[in-house]
Amino acid sequence: MKIERINDNTVKFFITYVDIEKRGFARDEIWYNRERGEQLFWQMMDEAHEREDISFDGPLWIQVQAFEKGLEVTVTIAKNVMDTEDDSELGSLLRSAIDEARDQQSVLDQLSELDELEAEADAWAPLAMETNDFEAIISLSKRTGDMFSDLDLKLYHYQDRYYLWIDFPDEMEPEDEENALSLLAEYLTFSTQTQPMLEEYGKLILDGDVFAKVRHYF
């Protein structure tokens, strides 16, 4: 799970479905089992407190966005609100956020089913991940080893952000793909940018074995 502190009051979490399952939660549970969804949420809050010393005291605003490979959860602490929320109010707020994200996921699932009619069931579509800190790319490169040496990677710079375009080869095992994506998600966030947009407006910095080149130059 990646934790990004946006400002003093707002924190973003990025967690893959692979990571969610490793934590003992079935993918469907977080959408349809209120208690299990709340357990995952508070587990994420506790981890943020332990890793980043972030305190979630006060009323919370929660937004959950579903991506094909995982979830983005934005939590804002409303410091200027005097009244605190009780557990039932917070639970209702969290439930609403999860319900909205579940609707997003339903659309993604339907699109995925259409994609499967045109491609191999275990073939993952290319995707982009991003960060605003190049140090995240450097830190990630030190952990990748040869994991990504056979992947078609491209690193772009666009509007003060770095975008990694990943194209998984057809012959790559699904388990290896999931492990690779789980590692990437510790440092990068899912992006909605497309390769044509990045090709046209972004600046290509590195391609091929991107992480080996980053280790070489940095």
From Swiss-Prot:
It holds the Pfam family MecA. It comes from the Bacteria. InterPro entries: MecA_C_sf, Neg-reg_MecA. One of its GO terms (molecular function) is protein-macromolecule adaptor activity. Belongs to the MecA family. HAMAP family: MecA. NCBIfam families: PRK02315.1-5 (NF002644). Homodimer. Enables the recognition and targeting of unfolded and aggregated proteins to the ClpC protease or to other proteins involved in proteolysis. The N-terminal domain probably binds unfolded/aggregated proteins; the C-terminal domain interacts with ClpC. This is Adapter protein MecA. It comes from Exiguobacterium sp. (strain ATCC BAA-1283 / AT1b). The lineage of its organism: Bacteria, Bacillati, Bacillota, Bacilli, Bacillales. The gene is mecA.
